[in-house]
């Protein structure tokens, strides 16, 4: 950790952080107390779970606890990058809105503590769908 502090102090890096796919809640809580990492990358979606696309491993979390932890992180100036944003499946906020991944992404980024999101897209049509959602915010 001293290495990263030194690199940041000397201007070599502006920020440092970490990402984790599982068993990360305690890491985020500890970081909220110690304020060492500037940025965290965390699985976050409407379902509170995901299946890893390569390993097939299932992961879930206590959504209320995670939102509380991320709310605290955001209030302390820690950058929160959401990943696995579409891995909870299609989402619709109401019966009159067609379920889809763009709506799932909207659900994620409407949380004020989310600084940015890693969004998986496989083609230009999906890029256009996501841009449309982002432009409507």
Predicted regions and their residues:
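Beta/alpha (TIM)-barrel catalytic core signal, keyed to glycine-rich beta->alpha loops juxtaposed to Asp/Glu
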Residues: 1-137
């Amino acid at each position: 950790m001293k290495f990263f502090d030194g690199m940041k102090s000397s201007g070599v890096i502006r920020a440092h952080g970490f990402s984790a796919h599982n068993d990360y809640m305690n890491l985020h809580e500890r970081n909220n107390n110690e304020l060492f990492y500037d940025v965290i990358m965390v699985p976050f979606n409407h379902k509170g779970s995901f299946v890893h696309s390569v390993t097939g491993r299932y992961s879930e979390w206590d959504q209320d606890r995670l939102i509380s932890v991320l709310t605290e992180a955001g209030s302390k100036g820690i950058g929160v990058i959401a990943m696995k944003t579409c891995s909870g499946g299609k989402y619709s906020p109401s019966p009159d809105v067609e379920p889809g991944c763009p709506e799932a992404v909207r659900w994620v980024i409407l949380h004020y503590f989310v600084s940015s999101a890693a969004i998986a897209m496989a083609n230009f049509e999906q890029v256009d769908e996501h841009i449309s959602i982002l432009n409507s915010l």
